[in-house]
């Protein structure tokens, strides 16, 4: 049994609508272990650093405005196949076509305000986790 870790973010729209507990409960119900968690309010520099791979895309400025508009909750999730399983559970970016039962189907407002983020690969998960957490803040079981 090989456990993986992935980064999850509960985005500003979900935080502002008091969905943190609901999302965490659903994660635990799906077998994800939360091994690190914190709430923070990103400044522009932090948001741009995190989303640097999107800096040349048309939606970048809107994404940065959104991600700095209110607090977020960042979590490190652990389970077998964590990256793939969490991405499946999140649903597609566009909530209008997200599958029933996914987080984005249930909670997203639109493609930008889509409630949650998840790492798209193991390599990116490692980079994203390190962006927000020191090793001493992660309590792997």
Swiss-Prot record:
Residues at the catalytic site: 117 (pros-phosphohistidine intermediate)
EC numbers for this chain: 2.7.4.6
Transmembrane portions of the chain: none
Gene Ontology MF term list: ATP binding; metal ion binding; nucleoside diphosphate kinase activity
GO BP terms, alphabetized: CTP biosynthetic process; GTP biosynthetic process; UTP biosynthetic process
CC per GO annotation: cytoplasm
Any Pfam family hit: NDK
InterPro entries referenced in this protein's UniProt entry, alphabetically: NDK-like_dom, NDK-like_dom_sf, Nucleoside_diP_kinase, Nucleoside_diP_kinase_AS
N-terminal signal peptide: none
Keywords: ATP-binding, Cytoplasm, Kinase, Magnesium, Metal-binding, Nucleotide metabolism, Nucleotide-binding, Phosphoprotein, Transferase
Binding site for ATP: 11, 59, 87, 93, 104, 114
Keyword Transferase: yes
Annotated compartments: Cytoplasm
Reported cofactor(s): Mg(2+)
Catalytic activity: a 2'-deoxyribonucleoside 5'-diphosphate + ATP = a 2'-deoxyribonucleoside 5'-triphosphate + ADP; a ribonucleoside 5'-diphosphate + ATP = a ribonucleoside 5'-triphosphate + ADP
Domain of life the protein comes from: Bacteria
Family, per entry: Belongs to the NDK family.
Protein role: Major role in the synthesis of nucleoside triphosphates other than ATP. The ATP gamma phosphate is transferred to the NDP beta phosphate via a ping-pong mechanism, using a phosphorylated active-site intermediate.
Matches recorded under HAMAP family: NDP_kinase
PANTHER family referenced in this protein's UniProt entry, alphabetically: NUCLEOSIDE DIPHOSPHATE KINASE, NUCLEOSIDE DIPHOSPHATE KINASE DDB_G0292928-RELATED
Subunit organization: Homotetramer.
Name listed for the protein in its UniProt record: Nucleoside diphosphate kinase
Gene that this sequence comes from: ndk
């Amino acid at each position: 049994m090989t456990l993986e870790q992935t980064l999850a973010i509960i985005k500003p729209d979900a935080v502002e609508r008091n969905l943190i507990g609901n999302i965490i409960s659903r994660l635990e119900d799906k077998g994800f272990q939360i091994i690190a968690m914190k709430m923070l309010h990103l400044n522009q520099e932090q948001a741009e650093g995190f989303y640097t791979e999107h800096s040349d895309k048309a939606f970048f400025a809107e994404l940065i405005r959104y991600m700095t508009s209110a607090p977020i909750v960042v979590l490190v999730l652990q389970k077998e196949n964590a990256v793939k399983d969490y991405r499946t559970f999140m649903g597609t970016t566009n909530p209008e076509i997200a599958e029933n039962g996914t987080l984005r189907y249930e909670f997203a407002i639109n493609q930008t305000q889509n409630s949650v983020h998840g790492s798209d690969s193991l390599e990116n998960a490692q980079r994203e986790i390190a962006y927000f957490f020191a090793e001493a803040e992660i309590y792997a079981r």
